[in-house]
Amino acid sequence: MILKRISILNYKNLEQVELNFSAKLNCFFGQNGMGKTNLLDAVYFLSFCKSAGNPIDSQNIRHEQDFFVIQGFYEAMDGTPEEIYCGMKRRSKKQFKRNKKEYSRLSDHIGFIPLVMVSPADSELIAGGSDERRRFMDVVISQYDKEYLDALIRYNKALVQRNTLLKSEQPVEEELFLVWEEMMAQAGEVVFRKREAFISEFIPIFQSFYLYISQDKEQVGLTYESHARGASLLEALKESRGRDKIMGYSLRGIHKDELNMLLGDFPIKREGSQGQNKTYLVALKLAQFDFLKRTGSTVPLLLLDDIFDKLDASRVEQIVKLVAGDNFGQIFITDTNREHLDRILYKVGSDYKMFRVENGAINEMEEKDQ
């Protein structure tokens, strides 16, 4: 899938933006806080029906405005045009349309335009709680497996209902608990099986990217832990019910799964330097891209936001070689350092566009300006 053109009104600090893109490489440079990340976030919104940074849609409306609109004009692999529209008004329901037809369920859109974003916020994958790492698995698997996404939605709905019963000050019949626990167990088993299969297939891809970027300097790994492994999830939920009532929430289940991120045999959270952490995250996301490309029927979009920060020159060079090659489709990349972008452009050749971003205004640079 190629994003040919985007139209943005009142999204974050972007008042009015109309841009035509290169099918290969699109570079955005400017100082921090000018709107580079917001432009990438608008592209992300068109794939995931939400912002990468702020899940509260109304807070993404430009200050002193009442709405935002994002429209993306795409071309599928077979040349078919696709138009995606998102509109949000304060105190109103978000509208999301494909070719002027509104989706009845936003989840039906997920995976239609596969996308991978690498950004400074990825540091939370290492530094943050286990929910960040579960979200990483969810974002990847949901883009190619509708059964997974449906099971995850069912599980989370049942979890909310069970937690409500656990907090109840009135006695609750066991049968009522069982209704939601059986739904959690059934959906949770699906989620567990698919997460386990994904991680097993993903690990060697991730390791190969890390070794390439680091030039074989360190070994990395991933291990997946779940209450569903080697036990009945339903029995675990029933057994934990007494403790859960005391706590007021569910202590067992696939919502507590963990993805351990290792440097050698130790947690990278404890052992990794800034450069190693950044290399780990970039390799993780590039492996995500490669996995989705192998699994799906269309090449994902790749968004690289300030990717070179905290990396030494040799690792920057390895990443430049990777993204300048033919393995990636359409790329959107931001940087405050024009030299980083120029080095990539030199390797890519002629199929690129360069944009200057300043105070929410984004302008394509002419050849003579470059």
Regions found by a protein language model. Give the residues of each.
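Conserved lysine of the Walker
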Residues: 36
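Conserved NTPase motor "head" modules and their coupling/switch loops across ABC/AAA+ ATPases, GTPases
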Residues: 1-31, 172-186, 190-303, 310, ...
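A conserved P-loop NTPase coupling/switch region
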Residues: 103-115, 119-182, 186, 364-365
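Structural recognition of the conserved hydrophobic beta-strand(s) that form the central parallel beta-sheet
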Residues: 72, 330-337
